[in-house]
């Protein structure tokens, strides 16, 4: 490129973001690295002192400057507090989506543009391109379906996509580790992060209890309102759960839904977990334009789910109704529904309820 474009690479200390930086340096971009200090304690698996040192070493190896930006207050307000509140209301949130919106593609992008960078880059397995026909930026799945992370990026806007590079999206994980080794990065074989970063042991209930969320016991009920037993608190259960209910119903029963108003949990048969449609709020259309007509597409309601054929109906209030060709199991309020047209992410929203 005739004039080097400046890129601020979001670095976590892991191999994906480090390899992203290496790829961009090789492509001729002028890169610097940045880590967002998010979690308020060292027990977190995110942005720990060890992770920061791994990121700093990778940046140094690549000839990049490295910064740490403290965003703990915003992370607490926009991600952790919301996580607790959503569980308290009987919903099941996805904090990674909130973190991407508010921190990685919110706070970090704002800082980067203020500091004179042209782009930010992350190690997400997804792709961005420009549709020459429409002049709109598009978000696409990562080339490797098993690692694709486009589900957690559906809230990206045209402004953000115009300043975003996703260099690892064209590769699979083994290739990315090879790229890191070729660049001489010490974290090439570092393990992948698991679970929610601020709940490193996976004990969500313990975290919520430490955060002061009351775990108020209540009733398990069936559709006729009959009490089947007592539960230990709404956050202890999730839609589709069968084990650990402690209910002697004479047959297998599953969590169908949680009611935060009267603190009850509805139980029923596996067949009752299936629903043909859902309503979603806080909808984002990546094109920036709400479709005037229903859209034939495919949708997924969980990160690891295979998308299912459906029709998406934009609603006058800005919401979204999704009607599936075949009923879907355990559609969960608080999770995201994300719409796809082939490899292209159309957008999505937060599930309010199934129908």
Task: Describe each region flagged by the PLM.
Residues 40, 121-355:
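AMP-forming adenylation/ATP pyrophosphatase catalytic core
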Residues 1-154, 165, 174, 255:
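ATP-dependent adenylation/nucleotidyltransferase module used to activate substrates
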């Amino acid at each position: 490129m005739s004039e080097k474009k400046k890129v601020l690479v979001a670095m976590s200390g892991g191999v994906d973001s480090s390899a992203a930086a290496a790829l961009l340096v090789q492509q001729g971009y002028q890169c610097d690295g940045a880590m967002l200090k998010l979690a308020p304690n060292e027990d977190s698996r995110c942005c720990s002192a060890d992770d920061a040192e791994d990121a700093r070493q990778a940046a140094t190896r690549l000839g990049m400057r490295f910064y740490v930006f403290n965003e703990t207050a915003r992370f607490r307000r926009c991600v952790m507090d919301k996580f607790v509140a959503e569980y308290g209301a009987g919903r099941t949130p996805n904090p990674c989506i909130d973190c991407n919106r508010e921190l990685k593609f919110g706070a970090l992008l704002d800082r980067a543009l203020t500091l004179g960078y042209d782009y930010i880059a992350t190690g997400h397995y997804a792709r961005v391109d420009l549709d020459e026909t429409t002049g709109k930026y598009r978000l696409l799945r990562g080339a490797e379906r098993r690692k694709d992370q486009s589900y957690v990026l559906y809230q990206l806007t045209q402004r953000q996509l115009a300043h975003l590079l996703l260099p690892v999206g064209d590769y699979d994980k083994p290739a990315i580790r090879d790229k890191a080794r070729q660049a001489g990065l010490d974290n090439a074989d570092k393990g992948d992060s698991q679970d929610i970063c601020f709940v490193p042991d996976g004990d969500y209930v313990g975290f919520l209890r430490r955060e002061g969320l009351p775990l108020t016991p209540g009733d398990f009920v069936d559709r006729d309102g009959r009490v089947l037993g007592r539960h230990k608190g709404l956050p202890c259960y999730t839609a589709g759960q069968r084990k650990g209910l402690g209910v002697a119903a004479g047959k297998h029963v599953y969590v169908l839904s949680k009611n935060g108003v009267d603190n009850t949990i509805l139980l029923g048969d596996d067949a009752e977990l299936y629903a043909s449609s859902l309503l979603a709020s806080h909808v984002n259309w990546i094109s920036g334009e709400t479709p005037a007509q229903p859209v034939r597409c495919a949708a997924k309601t969980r990160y690891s789910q295979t998308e299912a054929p459906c029709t998406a109906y934009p609603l006058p209030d800005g919401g979204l109704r999704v009607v599936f060709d075949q009923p879907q199991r355990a559609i969960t309020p608080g999770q995201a529904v994300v719409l796809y047209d082939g490899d292209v992410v159309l957008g999505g929203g937060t599930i309010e309820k199934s129908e």
